[in-house]
């Protein structure tokens, strides 16, 4: 049985162009789609197993990356955007028509990822953004209904795709969080 991770990686992870200049994210609406402009390439692109991230129907994981918040601009139909959960650390702006999360923003200036917005690169009209490089919060897919006994197969499939599975973030991102906390304590 084939383990499905996400439509954008199920047939292999497609590498980015290495010179992606940005593009336009488009929601799934046929009428008045929300469009969000992104300047530059994405960073820390990964498969995410958390239950907060938007994912297409049938996907076990979302695919999410970050970009500097100043590189995100709502271009069209921003009146259709609404925050999904105002109490969440990441304020996810979703289209009220189709439910697609267009971007997520952290407003807490003390948060280690303040200044980075979370986006779903599969929504780009253009091709070539940086490819996913790891999988985060892998065990969390159990919370979304995956049977615990399937986890071995899921982790094996992620590794087969070249997406090292972590039950938190990647070591580089965990180091960045710890560095931020240490600097804040020293201040």
UniProtKB/Swiss-Prot annotation:
Metabolic or biological pathway: One-carbon metabolism; formaldehyde degradation; formate from formaldehyde (glutathione route): step 1/3
Gene: gfa
InterPro entries the record matches: CENP-V/GFA, Formald_GSH, Mss4-like_sf
Enzyme class: lyase
GO biological process: formaldehyde catabolic process
Cofactor annotation remark: Binds 2 Zn(2+) ions per subunit.
Cofactor(s) listed in the protein's UniProt record: Zn(2+)
Gene Ontology MF terms in the entry: S-(hydroxymethyl)glutathione synthase activity; zinc ion binding
Keyword Lyase recorded: yes
Gene3D superfamilies given in the database record: glutathione-dependent formaldehyde- activating enzyme (gfa)
Protein keywords: Lyase, Metal-binding, Zinc
Family: Belongs to the Gfa family.
Binding site for Zn(2+) 2: 48, 50, 53
Any single Pfam family the record assigns to this protein: GFA
Record domain CENP-V/GFA: where: 20-167
Entry function: Catalyzes the condensation of formaldehyde and glutathione to S-hydroxymethylglutathione.
Record's protein name: Glutathione-dependent formaldehyde-activating enzyme
Annotated NCBIfam families: formald_GSH, PRK05417.1
Residues annotated to bind Zn(2+) 1: 27, 29, 95, 98
Reaction(s) this enzyme catalyzes, per UniProt: S-(hydroxymethyl)glutathione = glutathione + formaldehyde
Species per Swiss-Prot/TrEMBL record: Bradyrhizobium sp. (strain ORS 278)
